[in-house]
């Protein structure tokens, strides 16, 4: 093995702006399979850490793969530090997690990482389920989010259903959802972006609520009728990219929503069941 050791000059290590921890598929455009190209389109470098590796989403007639073993998962995280690839790290994002033990491992890694990066932005998309499907992750994941990841996050991006699960509060109207989001805020958790706040079905609108301790901003977007998967992952990728490029939170949320709409319409025009990224018009 020693004869294969070529790269031990850590001063030459490739550096990341973002570490993205979430699912990966061989076929399709969900999780890091859509987030990584979207982030790179924004001129940012990202390292992808998979939590599950799947052939495709379960919405096809065949489906293979599963959660990454804990030993591998912890090794992926540890290797980034062993390669000295995190000197310029600015943010860590999380999406679909395979197991509660992964969440605990990730939280321990983030806690240690923050000692060297006190300004690190940690953004958690607490993927648990949705109103139509209910909980579609393992039943011990919601408590793992509450116990391990929420205390570390500066921002989270739940949908209405996930907000209900995390808070134990009914969130089916906008005021109750905002109140529930505010109940999660802390000295660490500065903002909650509710990605499916109550919209106007008749006017074909959907709403995103940006909630912080001193403000609430509700952003409306056109509703696109589609079964496309991965739009939430794309939204989070665009949001973190906007924040790292210096956009204010409300502006970054607004621009992320517009980009998702653009991608969805572009995908529909190309008659694809999987998201297709058009060129990024704005630098």
Swiss-Prot record:
Alphabetically ordered keywords of this record: ATP-binding, Kinase, Magnesium, Metal-binding, Nucleotide-binding, Transferase, Zinc
Binding site for ATP: 125, 157, 162, 195, 221-224, 231
Recorded GO CC terms: cytosol
MF (Gene Ontology): ATP binding; hydroxymethylpyrimidine kinase activity; magnesium ion binding; pyridoxal kinase activity; zinc ion binding
Pathway stated in the Swiss-Prot or TrEMBL entry: Cofactor metabolism; pyridoxal 5'-phosphate salvage; pyridoxal 5'-phosphate from pyridoxal: step 1/1; Cofactor metabolism; pyridoxal 5'-phosphate salvage; pyridoxine 5'-phosphate from pyridoxine: step 1/1; Cofactor metabolism; pyridoxal 5'-phosphate salvage; pyridoxamine 5'-phosphate from pyridoxamine: step 1/1
Binding annotation for Mg(2+): 136, 162
GO biological process: pyridoxal 5'-phosphate salvage
EC number: 2.7.1.35
Cited CDD domains: pyridoxal_pyridoxamine_kinase
Catalyzed chemical reaction(s): pyridoxal + ATP = pyridoxal 5'-phosphate + ADP + H(+); pyridoxine + ATP = pyridoxine 5'-phosphate + ADP + H(+); pyridoxamine + ATP = pyridoxamine 5'-phosphate + ADP + H(+)
Binding site for substrate: 23, 59, 233
Known cofactor(s): Mg(2+)
Pfam families, A to Z: Phos_pyr_kin (PF08543)
EC category name: transferase
Function: B6-vitamer kinase involved in the salvage pathway of pyridoxal 5'-phosphate (PLP). Catalyzes the phosphorylation of pyridoxine (PN), pyridoxal (PL), and pyridoxamine (PM), forming their respective 5'-phosphorylated esters, i.e. PNP, PLP and PMP.
PANTHER family associated with the record: PYRIDOXAL KINASE (PTHR10534), PYRIDOXINE_PYRIDOXAL_PYRIDOXAMINE KINASE (PTHR10534:SF15)
Family, similarity comment: Belongs to the pyridoxine kinase family. PdxK subfamily.
Quaternary structure and partners: Homodimer.
Protein's name in the database: Pyridoxine/pyridoxal/pyridoxamine kinase
Species this protein is from: Shigella dysenteriae serotype 1 (strain Sd197)
Phylogenetic lineage: Bacteria, Pseudomonadati, Pseudomonadota, Gammaproteobacteria, Enterobacterales
């Amino acid at each position: 093995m020693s004869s294969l050791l070529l790269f031990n000059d850590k001063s030459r290590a490739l550096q990341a702006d973002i570490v993205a921890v979430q699912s990966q598929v061989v076929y399709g455009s969900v999780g890091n399979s859509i987030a990584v190209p979207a982030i790179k389109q924004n001129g940012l470098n990202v390292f992808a850490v998979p939590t599950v590796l799947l052939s495709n989403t379960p919405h096809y007639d065949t489906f293979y793969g599963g959660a990454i073993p804990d030993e591998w998962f912890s090794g992926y995280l540890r290797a980034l530090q062993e390669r000295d690839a995190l000197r310029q790290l600015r943010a860590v994002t999380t999406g679909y997690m395979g197991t509660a033990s992964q969440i605990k491992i990730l939280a321990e890694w983030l806690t240690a990482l923050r000692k060297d990066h006190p300004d690190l932005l940690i953004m958690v998309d607490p993927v648990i389920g949705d109103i139509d499907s209910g909980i579609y992750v393992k039943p011990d994941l919601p408590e793992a989010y509450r116990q391990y990841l929420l205390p570390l996050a500066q921002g989270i991006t739940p949908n209405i259903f996930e907000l209900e699960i995390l808070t134990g509060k009914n969130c089916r109207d906008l005021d109750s959802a905002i109140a529930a989001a505010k109940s999660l805020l802390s000295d660490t958790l500065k903002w909650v972006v509710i990605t499916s706040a109550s919209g106007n079905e008749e006017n074909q609108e959907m709403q995103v609520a940006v909630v912080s301790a001193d403000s609430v901003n509700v952003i409306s977007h056109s509703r696109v009728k589609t079964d496309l998967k991965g739009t939430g992952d794309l939204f989070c990728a665009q949001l973190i990219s906007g924040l790292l490029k210096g956009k204010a939170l409300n502006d970054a949320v607004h621009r992320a929503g517009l980009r998702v709409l653009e991608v969805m319409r572009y995908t529909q025009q190309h008659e694809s069941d999987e998201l297709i990224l058009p060129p990024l018009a704005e630098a």
